[in-house]
């Protein structure tokens, strides 16, 4: 099993997979008579069909036991999916490039600083939300519409990956 190296989440490193949603270094302008700073268009919601709708949900995630064997990734071929942490806690992100199936060798892991969210572009393979805390809440923006928008791929035994965030502690 290949151990995934957990990288800091940066816009540059994550660009092949989607957008990092954060205020640091982002364009902004003042609104509401100068009382509010708007960080505008941090990510685009992608949908496949004109009749699709962008929806907002909250996911309450439970921590999985670590180290974690990564045996499955999913993708959303009909729309993007964004996760923004609501409680300010760091969380883990596991992604692989767009393709017919995810390539185990191309899979990468990132850690958010708790003030960063991510927007997975259409078709990007990713692990379901991975909280480090016992329980965490995420604002989720994704697509609602006709058609199956979730494909799952299970890795063969020889392609399994392991994720161990414990080096992040301390």
Swiss-Prot record:
Q: Is Lyase among the key words of this record?
A: yes
Catalytic activity reads:
(S)-ureidoglycolate = urea + glyoxylate
Annotated keywords: Lyase, Purine metabolism
What is the required cofactor set for this protein?
Ni(2+)
Tell me the SUPFAM superfamilies matching this sequence. RmlC-like cupins
Q: Could you tell me which InterPro entries the record lists for this protein?
A: RmlC_Cupin_sf, UAH_cupin, Ureidogly_lyase, Ureidogly_lyase_bac, Ureidoglycolate_lyase_dom_sf
Q: Which GO terms describe its molecular function?
A: ureidoglycolate hydrolase activity; ureidoglycolate lyase activity
Q: Which domain of life is it from?
A: Bacteria
The record's Gene3D superfamilies line, in alphabetical order, gives:
Ureidoglycolate hydrolase
* A single GO BP: purine nucleobase catabolic process
Q: What are its E.C. numbers?
A: 4.3.2.3
Pathway it belongs to? Nitrogen metabolism; (S)-allantoin degradation
State the PANTHER family in the record.
UREIDOGLYCOLATE HYDROLASE, UREIDOGLYCOLATE LYASE
Query: Record's family?
Result: Belongs to the ureidoglycolate lyase family.
Q: How does it assemble?
A: Homodimer.
Function comment: Catalyzes the catabolism of the allantoin degradation intermediate (S)-ureidoglycolate, generating urea and glyoxylate. Involved in the utilization of allantoin as nitrogen source.
Q: What is this protein called?
A: Ureidoglycolate lyase
Q: Which organism is it from?
A: Pseudomonas syringae pv. syringae (strain B728a)
From the UniProt record, report the name of the gene that encodes this protein: allA
